[in-house]
Amino acid sequence: MQNSPTTEQTKNIVAERIQELRQLIAHNNRLYYENIPPRREIHDYEYDELFKELQELESRFPEFQSADSPTQIVGGSVSEGFKKVQHSVPMLSIENKPVTKMLSEVRSIIKELKDDAISIDIVAEPKIDGLSCSIRYEKHQLVRAATRGDGLEGEDITVNVHSISEIPKILPLDAPEVIEIRGEVYMSNSDFKQYTAQQNKIGEKPPENPRNAAAGSLRQLDPSVTASRPLRFFAYAWGEISNSFAKSQWDALQTLRGWGFKVCDDIRLLYSSDELNSYFEEMQERRSELDFTIDGIVYKLNSLSLQERVGQTNRAPRWAAAQKFPPEKRETLLQNITISVGRSGALTPVAELLPVRLLGTTVSNATLHNQDEVECKDFRIDDTIVVQRAGDVIPQVVSVVIEKRLSGSIPFVFPSACPVCGSKAVREPREAVWKCTGGLTCPAQSLERLKHFVSRDAFNIDGLGEKNIELFYNKGLLASPVDIFRLEEILSPPLLWQQKPSEFKPLQEWDGWGELSANNLFRAIRTKQKITLYRFIYALGIPKVGEVTAKILADNYVSLDNWQSSMLKAAERESECYQHLISIDGIGSVVADEIVSFFAEAHNIQVLDSLKNYLSVEDFTKPAIISSNISGKIVVFTGELEKRSRKAAKIEAEKFGAKVATDVSRKTDIVIAGTDPGSKLRKAQELGIKILSEDEWEHLINEK
């Protein structure tokens, strides 16, 4: 019989798990709160489960509690593009837990208060899936609006909020002199449908869901963009007030409604556990009928005096709870498994489903990720499967209903050739993905690479989104990126003395186009004929060369001609050029081989040379370096930084002459450790490398 772990072993295991959870949650918090549109790498339901696990471990092992834990921090940091705003009263999040648990905790507190006369009634409201904000009024005038941010500090969105018609700009004279109204900015489902249609019409990729649409619209640096979007607002709380204006949550909401704010009509005042359960079930059933997205129910004690007596933690009020709906699941038929081809040649199995309604959306396909996923869950054509919308966003095929499987069904066999071009498919060791070897001769890869070429972080050409790329590609007008810059020549109306090919009508005569939209597209393309080197490198879509790697290459090679010449010489693995390439921090042999392979294709060289005839690719210019005591030092950042984003910290370090590396090695001079630093800190300790806290780093770079 195996011995059970010692107490010390158990603590070590728990400490590692807590660190792992904190890093995963903090990483997804950054993605969610600091991106436009917000995103996560895991679904909301999984995120909540991880968060609960971390809370439970910290509760059971209080010696591992930390003020820097995600369980003690609200939201995310402030975007660098907005002015910072301090919340006079913190915008706390509401803890995800069953209302029964909240009531049990409240009753325990009441018992300690020795006040048996206190009655408990609850205000229940739908949990709107939008973007929280706080709107401040002084002398009845709207003076400022801010996002939640990290709960203590948000983004100043005052100008953008002025364009939302459902937010009053002036309050009645009976309102307090100073009051902060808090609520949710959202986009209704019907407005989102129209907005999506508009985006598709102009060839732009629409946001994935109304929540992303609302968040992306509100956090625009150009207020005219926000004004053009159909945003709405529900009020449900308040922050700082100069004087009390209600005795209960319910009465306060009615007062807000009287002042001109929209308050959700589905809010209820409830008095018993049966009513609470019935309301939750009712709203879960009705959610697909509503014209706004909800992902659960928020419960609050109705009595404001009781709220005050019950109090709050540094993260969340004790008098409130948020209970999320579980993912909605449905059974449907797996009609087929098709293979999609990405720009890098990745072959992805896709489930073609008998259309099924999930939360008001018709789901007809879902990714099956890779061969291992298909084989592990044994998905077969004509199976009855369970599909869900986890996080109410991405459809997932969860499992097979084995008892409904037809006799004679056969396992799915992954293809050995690309379904589009017929080229051989290969799967590298330790890789989960099969890839087409056809390269740019594969039409599917060509199309996806064209989409990537004009994407936001590449050429970012207004009006030339995925839909229009597909349109021009299917018309035979686009085969390679250089064709984009020939569109005006081919599709503009001919001048009197010009002879032009007759097979293409002028773009302004196409369905859905006119003179203005055609000219706008041509103008947008012309404005992008000057581009920085790193964006050009990224736009080429070389496998494993993302935005960061593209910047590293631009920094090292400075000009397009120098980079191209060096990469051609690097085809010889023993050459000095190849050895230099693999020695660059952040590149390595795997990425280097992808770059060299790209330049080994004659077609790619032809495209590059043709693009040079249309483009001006700017040489990489290093920012002016300030002489300092860290000049020439190699530094590594690890963990979560509190005062600035990792990207901003890197830029600042480079400004002072330091070189920022991604991994710790014997060459590293300094490691700056934020919260939850992980393995890099341990390695630095083992190597005896100087370790600084974020504050110590600040002091070092500011020393004269």
UniProtKB/Swiss-Prot annotation:
Pfam families: BRCT (PF00533), DNA_ligase_aden (PF01653), DNA_ligase_OB (PF03120), DNA_ligase_ZBD (PF03119), HHH_2 (PF12826). It is an enzyme of class 6 (ligase). Signal peptide: none annotated. It comes from the Bacteria. One of its GO terms (molecular function) is metal ion binding. Residues 625-704 form the BRCT domain. Its EC number is 6.5.1.2. NCBIfam families: dnlj, PRK07956.1. This is DNA ligase. It catalyses: NAD(+) + (deoxyribonucleotide)n-3'-hydroxyl + 5'-phospho-(deoxyribonucleotide)m = (deoxyribonucleotide)n+m + AMP + beta-nicotinamide D-nucleotide. CDD domains: BRCT_DNA_ligase_like, LIGANc. The keyword Metal-binding applies. GO terms for cellular component: cytosol. Its cofactor is Mg(2+); Mn(2+). The active site is at residue 127. NAD(+) binds at residues 44-48, 93-94, 125, 148, 184, 300, 324. It comes from Pelobacter propionicus (strain DSM 2379 / NBRC 103807 / OttBd1). Zn(2+) binds at residues 418, 421, 436, 442.
